[in-house]
């Protein structure tokens, strides 16, 4: 797997779970002899929703909710066969979305 790169993008609502998952990925990759670049924090997406509290009158009475989507990027440069096998067997938290691309 010469001149290869594995790019791993992690997304989730809880930044502690994402940081824990990136630490596991980095530790696994370094243990198998690959170079790691990252974790790189990407911009957090903030979605805001405003909801009327009152069903009829009192237009000024509103609640505001926010969902933050945190993202991290990890590049694994020159991965070995052991690195790929270890990453496939890695168990990550349930609240983390992982996207892996080869390049």
Swiss-Prot record:
InterPro entries: Ribosomal_uS10, Ribosomal_uS10_CS, Ribosomal_uS10_dom, Ribosomal_uS10_dom_sf. Keywords: Ribonucleoprotein, Ribosomal protein. Part of the 30S ribosomal subunit. This is Small ribosomal subunit protein uS10. It comes from Shewanella frigidimarina (strain NCIMB 400). One of its GO terms (cellular component) is ribonucleoprotein complex. The lineage of its organism: Bacteria, Pseudomonadati, Pseudomonadota, Gammaproteobacteria, Alteromonadales. It comes from the Bacteria. Belongs to the universal ribosomal protein uS10 family. It holds the Pfam family Ribosomal_S10. HAMAP family: Ribosomal_uS10. One of its GO terms (biological process) is translation. GO terms for molecular function: structural constituent of ribosome; tRNA binding. Involved in the binding of tRNA to the ribosomes. Gene3D superfamilies: Ribosomal protein S10 domain (3.30.70.600).
């Amino acid at each position: 797997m010469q001149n290869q790169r594995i790019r791993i993008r992690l997304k989730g609502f809880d930044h502690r779970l994402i940081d824990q998952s990136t630490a596991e990925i980095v530790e696994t990759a370094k243990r198998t002899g690959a170079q790691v670049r990252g974790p790189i924090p990407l911009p957090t997406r903030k979605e805001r929703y405003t909801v009327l509290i009152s069903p009829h009158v009192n237009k000024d009475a509103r609640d505001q909710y926010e969902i933050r989507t945190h993202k991290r990027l990890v590049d694994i440069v020159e991965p070995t066969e052991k690195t790929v096998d270890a990453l496939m067997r890695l168990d990550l938290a349930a609240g983390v979305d992982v996207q892996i691309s080869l390049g």
